[in-house]
Design a protein with these regions (language model features):
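Cleavable N-terminal export/targeting peptides
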Residues: 1-13, 127-128
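Charged, glycine/proline-rich intrinsically disordered loops and linkers
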Residues: 120-126, 130-137, 184-189, 274-282
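Outer-membrane beta-barrel pore domains
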Residues: 40-43, 84-88, 109, 118, ...
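Loop-centered beta-sheet repeat module
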Residues: 176-233
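Outer membrane beta-barrel
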Residues: 15-34, 45-176, 200-205, 209-216, ...
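Juxtamembrane/transmembrane-helix boundary motifs at the membrane-water interface
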Residues: 36-38
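Short, P/G- and charge-enriched loop/turn segments at secondary-structure junctions
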Residues: 13-14, 137-140, 192-195, 285
Length: 376
């Protein structure tokens, strides 16, 4: 975590007020998405056209053991508070975070800011409204950044040639309706429903990671993450998310791999035959469990001011679906991405990418992104 934080901090170029121990930083990305093969239906399949992502962050140092961070984000969902928390640090091995933050889960959320990753959109397991057909799929496995209220205890231990990180946390967790079939992400950012836990029961999670120094400019990192809880108001519908990630830095070449899986319990209701597309199995049992998993494989290679990126990612959903859903009992989408990021002035980058979506339930789609992103 600290290795990543140092890289991000160096790339973000914050404005620092040494006298007051304050840091101010931010980033902006303007991206244009088009679906050239089906331009007439693009608005119904995703957020085609221009979208902007803005983040503004203020960090305040109150001394050796206490800091505060506040971050405001603006994107397609409007203005949101991306973080507002205190860090109470005893030493490297023990830090307590309280407030509103992104809990430690997976690798990509550490670099979710558009200024810190080279593609215009996020990997499919972490999608937050940018993938084609995101409404039909109801996003990925866990949208990033996942922002929530709660408490986290984390720390880092340094040993010869290695760095060990851990985190455990309790947060409000994802939300859904009574009798729901999946998470309803609008409930987590709707002022009408309040920014509070919907069932009074915390969601808990943990992460453990290791980074190994393999020599000059060579680092191997790996991590495991988990999160579990209930998402309905009655706290009867449970979920479990597990993830594994690995990355390898070889001089200036970066290779990343990540896998996420979520098991979600859903309500079958009083009349499942009318509600769901598929009936009971041959044994007469109607399953109330769905599986949603996804993967992401990436390689980045810079050549001076130009960085080439190749990405292969995908999603799968298995389990019953609503009778009105266009998905099947097992639905899959694979995406192939070729991207170029060009440093045009300072840390400002021009991002371009071509993505091929291979759907099991819809026509395949070609998506083209062109955008500009940078920190300040």
């Amino acid at each position: 975590m600290l290795l990543v934080a140092r890289v991000v901090a160096a790339d973000s170029a914050p404005i620092q007020d040494r006298a007051a121990n304050r840091n101010f930083a931010g980033s902006i990305q303007l991206d244009y998405l088009t679906l050239p093969e089906h331009p007439s239906v693009a608005p119904t399949e995703g957020f085609a056209g221009a979208t902007v992502e803005l983040s503004l962050k203020l960090a305040m140092d109150f001394g050796e053991h206490t800091t505060a961070n506040v971050k405001v984000c603006y994107a397609c969902h409007g203005f949101e508070v991306g973080m507002a928390y205190f860090d109470l640090r005893y030493n490297d091995e023990l830090n307590v975070r309280v407030g509103r933050f992104t809990p430690s889960f997976g690798s990509f959320p550490l670099r979710h800011d558009p200024a810190n990753h080279m593609t215009s959109d996020k990997p499919l397991p972490y999608d937050m409204g940018r993938m084609v057909r995101f409404r039909e799929w109801n996003e990925g496995v866990l949208p990033a950044p996942w922002v929530d209220n709660g408490i986290e205890v984390n720390g880092t231990h340094f040993v010869s040639g290695a760095q060990l990180d851990y985190a455990v946390y309790a947060i409000g967790g994802p939300k859904g309706n009574a009798g729901g079939i999946d998470f309803d992400y609008t409930l987590s950012r709707s002022g009408e429903r309040y920014y509070v836990d919907n069932n009074g029961e915390p969601t808990v999670g943990a992460r453990a990671a290791i980074a190994l120094d393999l020599g000059p400019r060579r680092v191997l990192s790996a991590g495991l993450s988990t999160m579990a809880g209930h998402y309905d108001p009655a706290a009867k519908l449970g979920f479990l998310i597990a993830g594994a990630d690995a990355s390898l830095q070889l001089d200036r070449t970066s290779l990343r791999a990540e896998y996420l899986a979520r098991w979600t319990r859903f309500a079958t209701g009083d009349d499942p035959a009318a509600t769901f597309k598929y009936g009971p199995t041959a044994s007469g049992r109607l399953s109330s469990l769905s599986l949603r998993d996804g993967f992401d494989l990436e390689i980045e290679q810079p050549f001076g001011p130009v960085t080439l990126i190749a990405r292969w990612d995908g999603l799968r959903r298995a389990g019953n679906v609503l009778a009105t859903s266009p998905l099947r009992s097992t639905s899959i989408v694979l995406r192939y991405t070729a991207a170029v990021a060009i440093r045009i002035a300072g840390a400002l980058r021009l991002k371009t990418s071509v993505e091929r979506y291979d759907f099991s339930d819809f026509e395949d789609e070609l998506a083209v992104h062109v955008g500009i992103a940078g920190p300040f």
